[in-house]
């Protein structure tokens, strides 16, 4: 999606105030930033990385127009030399990132930016905005799809989304994560997301009787007729009239009622009663769709604890807003800085252990079991390190030399997870289609053990360090503490 707006000023103001200081000091020195997160939302075991396409769009189009410069000048905080510099700035650095749709884990770089310091600083907010939102919604969507156990999940959340972009991009990543489609028509036009939807209660209320409404809809869409049956009474009128329309019009004309939707009441009880009535009417092929404040926990309970007879789910606010865990805590931290022609590692230290960063320019390697094809761990190494798969591989806990795991030689393979997106400011990555991202994501998620994907107390996936990187980190901690 090419955004028609120039969003270059979508940045925290301090990006600009810092950049003027850099401009006055040494605007050409290079830095490396890692974009990563510290904690999975919903206390989950993984996330689904998303938002890269919008990062590419922003970085490709980074520039300040005359109106932008005039506005900044009006603030009386920036020199004319700096404003002149901004008026011609373009991104000239390197960006590496994990492909969209990949399952990812805390404390590993999702995006690595190497660029002149001002350029690297200016893109911070937009990168975090794109990735934080879309990764959050992709992850929530995947959890809901997982809970449905093969039953279709439809994204119905636009009216509860936080704004237009949240609805449009939320539908995009919901589809990447496995939803069957979306009710958001714009996302269908812009991205090719399958669009879904039939009727609202207002449609039924606009007719003299529920039967009249159903009949009119059936005659208009005889080969795609799904009826909303809870406007007045699901069991006393809705399902009765739906069956009657099927028998009076659809079946005599060679059509079948595709489905009925329930949007209120006890989903388990009503679905079982409706299923029985449909089956007794010879309509075993008619699907039952439910909606109304669903999430992965409700869906899991409906299927496993309550024995609901449901074929597909329409999910709205709990998906599009990730209602239970509405913030994805991605951060953007400097890990290396050029000095005298060399990249010097940098570290951020905190009294909170989880906020201590991993220094230096790093590679992210996914270690795979050669026999099963399943992921064993993700390993951070310094850029110059090479992994020899014919040798034992020792991976270390990010803070403790005594906590380690040895993976025997010749039992594993290694994948480099960070791929080049921009080189010297030029886009070198062919953006995959939405269908390609969706298929890739499904394949990659299949390499993650179910124990890591469970909802309650998931097994922690290892994101470990090489010995060389761990030693560097501990040395820097000792130096600065």
Where are these regions (language model features)?
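Short coil/turn segments at secondary-structure boundaries
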Residues: 70-71, 139-143, 157, 453-460
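Gly/Ser/Thr/Ala-enriched C-terminal appendages of enzymes
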Residues: 1-29, 33, 42-44, 279-281, ...
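Buried, small/hydrophobic-residue-enriched core segments of structured protein domains
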Residues: 1-30, 39-41, 77-78, 83-92, ...
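An N-terminal, globular interaction/scaffold subdomain
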Residues: 57-62, 97-100, 104
């Amino acid at each position: 999606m090419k955004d028609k707006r120039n969003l270059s000023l979508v940045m925290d103001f301090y990006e600009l105030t810092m950049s003027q200081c850099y401009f006055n000091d040494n605007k050409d020195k290079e830095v490396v930033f890692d974009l990563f997160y510290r904690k999975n939302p919903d206390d989950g075991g993984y996330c689904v990385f998303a938002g890269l396409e919008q990062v590419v769009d922003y970085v490709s189009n980074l520039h300040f127009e005359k109106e932008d410069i005039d506005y900044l000048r009006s603030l009386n905080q920036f020199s004319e030399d700096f404003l002149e510099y901004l008026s011609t700035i373009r991104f000239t650095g390197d960006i590496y990132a994990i492909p969209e749709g990949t399952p990812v884990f805390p404390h590993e770089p999702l995006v690595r930016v190497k660029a002149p310091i001002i350029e690297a600083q200016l893109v911070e907010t937009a990168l975090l905005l794109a990735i934080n939102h879309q990764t959050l919604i992709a992850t929530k969507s995947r959890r809901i799809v997982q809970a449905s156990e093969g039953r279709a999940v439809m994204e119905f959340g636009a009216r509860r989304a936080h704004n237009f972009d949240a609805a449009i991009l939320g539908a995009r990543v919901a589809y990447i994560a496995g939803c069957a489609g979306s009710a958001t028509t714009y996302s269908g036009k812009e991205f090719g997301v399958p669009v879904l939807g039939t009727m609202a209660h207002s449609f039924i209320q606009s007719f003299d009787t529920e039967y009249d409404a159903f009949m009119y809809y059936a005659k208009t869409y005889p080969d795609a007729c799904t009826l909303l049956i809870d406007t007045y009474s699901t069991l006393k009128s809705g399902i009765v009239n739906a069956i009657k329309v099927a028998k009076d019009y659809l079946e005599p004309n060679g059509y079948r009622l595709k489905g009925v939707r329930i949007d209120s009441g006890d989903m388990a009880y009503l679905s079982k009663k409706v299923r029985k009535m449909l089956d007794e009417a010879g309509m075993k092929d008619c699907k039952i769709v439910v909606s109304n404040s669903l999430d992965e926990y409700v869906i899991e309970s409906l299927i496993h604890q309550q024995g609901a007879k449901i074929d597909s789910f329409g999910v709205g606010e709990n998906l599009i807003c990730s209602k239970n865990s509405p913030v994805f805590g991605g951060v953007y931290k400097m890990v290396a800085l050029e000095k005298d022609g060399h990249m010097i590692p940098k570290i951020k230290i905190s009294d909170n252990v989880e906020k201590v960063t991993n220094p230096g320019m790093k590679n992210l390697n996914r270690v795979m079991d050669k026999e099963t094809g399943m992921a064993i761990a993700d390993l951070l190494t310094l850029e110059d390190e090479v992994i020899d798969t014919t040798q034992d591989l020792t991976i270390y806990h990010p803070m403790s030399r005594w906590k380690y795991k040895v993976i025997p030689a010749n039992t594993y393979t290694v994948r480099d997870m960070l791929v080049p997106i921009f080189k010297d400011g030029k886009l070198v990555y062919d953006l995959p289609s939405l269908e390609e991202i969706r298929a890739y994501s499904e394949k990659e998620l299949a390499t993650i053990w179910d124990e890591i994907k469970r909802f309650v107390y998931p097994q922690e996936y290892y994101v470990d360090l090489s010995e060389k990187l761990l030693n560097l980190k501990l040395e820097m901690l000792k130096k600065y503490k």
